[in-house]
Amino acid sequence: MKKTIWMALIMLSGVIVSAAQPKFTQKELAYLPATAQVALFKAGIITPSDVLEAQIAQVQKYNGSYNTELRDLGKELNTFNAGKINAICFDRFAEARKAAKAAEERYRNGTARRLEGVTVGVKNENNVIGWRVDMGSLLLKDVPPCTDDTPIIERLKNEGAILVFSTTVPELYVNCMTWSRLYGITRNPWNLAYGVGGSSGGSGAALAAGFCTIATGSDMGGSIRLPASMNGVYGFKPPFGRVPTSEISYETLGPLTRTFDDLVLMQDIIAGPHPKNHSSLRPKLDYPERYRPLKGAKVAVCYCNQWLDGGCDKEVNEALDKVAAALKKAGAEVKIIKSDWSVQNGEMKTFVAGLLSTEMYELFDAITSANKNLLCANLVPLLTNISGYNPKALIKATQMGMAAHADVQKEIFEDGCIALIMPTLATPFVAPAYQATPEDIAVVNGKSFISNDILLTPVWNLLNRYPVVDMPVMLSSKRVPIGVQIVGNTFDDLAAFRVAAGLSKVIPQMYTGDRFPDFREQK
């Protein structure tokens, strides 16, 4: 308690009393938020090397080995790194140690930048000069190193961040959990019997395990929000164009962090127009550190039980109950809605066909002539329907999105609500190698699922001008976290951030007290 109060005083006042300086344990250093780290670095209490070494120790203890030979793990899927997190493709710890020493010099000479010395896990999708981006696929294991930086990587580097490792992804980013024949299964630090979400699952798991301080993600069907929810971290799917990404309107890059304040900091750094990306929005939106209280605001809450045959898991409903109560405690008016503008069931196929009829088609068309025996099992059905990915499919998906947009506007935002809160997925209890075999399933209220219908995220990629914050709200009975989506109106990022900020003050936060992963394995 004394240490917590002391840290708060450091961060708020900048007053340092050297006699009161506490020692930090390895775990405390590994899980320190970026905002706290920077304050303590500036004060000379700890150094970037202290945090880096603590996080490397976490990796060595909990991650397991790397598949450095890039061999096919298909027959070893369940045994490779069994009992470990397995969230890292490869590390760059030698370079990181040098960067940490350079950061310490900047703190000494007063030239430290906003993320000086803060460690970043990089999704195996973002270009980093000299790093390999193989998309988790055996087909691409011999890809040459990158010769340029993705814009968000460029911006993180320019603010002094230290890139420490590449995080695991499902093959070609096409799975809601994270496993591949190239890197194996990534498991949940809160409970290794369950999945971490996807496709930014390695980033989410690395944060939860204390391997890094912040991490990059991307989202074209829920790939930031699913890992955020299942790993108990914050994630943000910005509206299309807010962060320079690709020209695929379903997709966006975004931040993953353990705290709301770190989410604000990272998003403010990576947002804004960039000459490499003509769809990036101008001018840059600035994200303030503080937000107005929720008193008097009207917020819609949808439990989404009507979106899925049999409804959502009872613990997901319990999480929404907690959110509704927290909103009222914060002084907000709550509007419960029961509308269904989902993309579940048959409409999920329309969404997927629309997505794969964008620039994604070129990728899938190219691999149809590749060795399909090297592909993960879940990808093969997508390739058998390649002729169905065409302009007509894209138009059909667009029309479905326009109808959903009209419904959302009428029921939520035209009625005075500043945001909508809804679940991220129908259950937190999903097999870590979901869809690898008929046994790798999810069970919701006694019903078995192996489809993407358990996901409640894709509608906001179809409607990708809506910003969505995903924040953790409770631990389930099996200690797998449950998060919710906070959806602002089109391009109204700050409304979603305002609601997340308000809830973060009244809902007990992860990575405080006894709310840390214990790396159990319990079904």
What is each residue range found by the language model?
Residues 1-21:
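Bacterial Sec-dependent N-terminal signal peptides
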Residues 21-142, 173-175, 512-523:
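Short, well-ordered alpha-helical
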Residues 44, 117, 123, 158, ...:
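Glycine-rich, small-residue loops and helix-cap segments
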Residues 45-48, 52-53, 101, 150, ...:
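Acyltransferase
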Residues 110, 115-141, 293-304, 353-410, ...:
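Short helix-loop capping/hinge segments that flank enzyme active sites or metal/cofactor-binding pockets
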Residues 148-150, 154-271, 463-483:
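Short glycine/serine-rich loop segments
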Residues 167-175, 341-344, 425-426:
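Short, solvent-exposed turn/loop segments enriched in Gly/Ser/Thr/Pro and often Arg
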Residues 234-321, 507-523:
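A short helix-breaking turn/cap at a secondary-structure junction
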